[in-house]
């Protein structure tokens, strides 16, 4: 097997059918401040598909887990996404604090989304945000640039809970590079969120 992780980026994945995608701490800034919104994230990718995902929030006794085709679980209890429509949903996002040249696009996207939803919030740990979406506590998610180790495990948890996530223009996610991620509890909500995001990216001529 091979390993693809934040600390070492790539450890011998060429030609490997089984690859572990690992983030030892998602939400590092929260962790250093003892804010519990941070997690260890481990995914197993097999032949280009994530088949197993585990997210372990730190400072708590929580475990989110999923195996492809077997559902998503929180501390051993099966979970599912909410049924909220777009206007009643809570959206999670980020403002690109690690690349502030992109922050204006993030703020403009948030400005366009906010009037159309119940609320828009930021946690600072993508894996936790996607898992809370899977658990039905939140309803949509958008982030302009994420690494595979940020979302691979939690993304499977979300999918197995009945949610959906894609890259730009509804393209499948590529687990080998940075990408935009749009996620939602329902396909129609993802489509609407994707349309808003795409309109802002087009205005800014954002091509990544």
Segments the model singles out, each with a brief description of its role:
Residues 1, 17-19, 51, 89, ...:
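Conserved acidic residues
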Residues 81-208:
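An extended, acidic
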Residues 6-7, 23-26, 30, 129, ...:
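Acidic active-site catalytic centers that drive phospho-/nucleotidyl reactions
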Residues 14-73:
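DPxDG-like acidic metal-binding loop motif
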Residues 1-25, 203-208:
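N-terminal subdomain of lithium-sensitive/metallo-dependent phosphomonoesterases centered on the IMPase/IPPase/PAP
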Residues 11-14, 33, 47, 65, ...:
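Solvent-exposed alpha-helices and their adjacent loops that cap or buttress functional pockets
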Residues 3, 28, 57, 66, ...:
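Residue-level signal for inorganic ion chemistry
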